[in-house]
Amino acid sequence: MPIGASKLKFRINYILNVMRTWYCFNIKNKNVKYNGFIRVMKGTRFNPGYEFVLGHNVQFGPNCLLDTGANMGNNILLAGNVCFIGKNDHTFNILGKTIWSSPRGKNNPIIVENDVWIGHGAIIMSGIKIGAGSIVASGAVVTKDVPPCAIVGGNPARIIKYRFDNDEDKKRHCEWLSKQ
């Protein structure tokens, strides 16, 4: 509990989070399967046309939009306004058809492995795999797979650096994560 916070306020917020999460996944979004503790802040939306599988300790910041399917591991942090969107939402190359009247394309799910932090306002395109232990910077647009323990940022997202300075530490961390 944070210093200076009242126990009553903490307990009320905890109960409200449990109720919001239960409502979100058992009443509103039955297409979401979860396995463990999940925290969903206000305004987070899941597209009912896709399947979502969530691990343990997954937190969605306020106003996240998951508009394409996702398989998420354990210990995932999504800051506010993170978007999972489809690359193939609109078919635009059918002769004699407008984009408006064209059928929607198929989007593959996004895979987020264990121990990933996705910063505020990041956009992740469908079919992307975000490797274990990775960090996606605020505002990044991820159009390609992210390797394990990489820190990526920019538009399009590129590797800025790795969480660990040497390959041995990265390997040990990934092995430890695979046992979790």
Predicted feature residues:
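Flexible, glycine/small-residue-enriched loop-and-beta-strand segment within the central core
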Residues: 42-54, 59-125, 163-164
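Terminal amphipathic alpha-helical/low-complexity segments used for targeting or macromolecular assembly
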Residues: 1-30, 36-37, 75, 90-95, ...
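A contiguous, mid-protein "functional segment" used to position or interact
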Residues: 141, 147-162
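Residue-level recognition of oxygen-bearing side chains
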Residues: 71, 129, 147
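A secondary-structure boundary/capping signal
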Residues: 42, 80, 138, 155-156
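Short-chain dehydrogenase/reductase
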Residues: 59, 117, 135, 151-153
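Beta-rich strand-turn-strand
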Residues: 117-135, 140-144
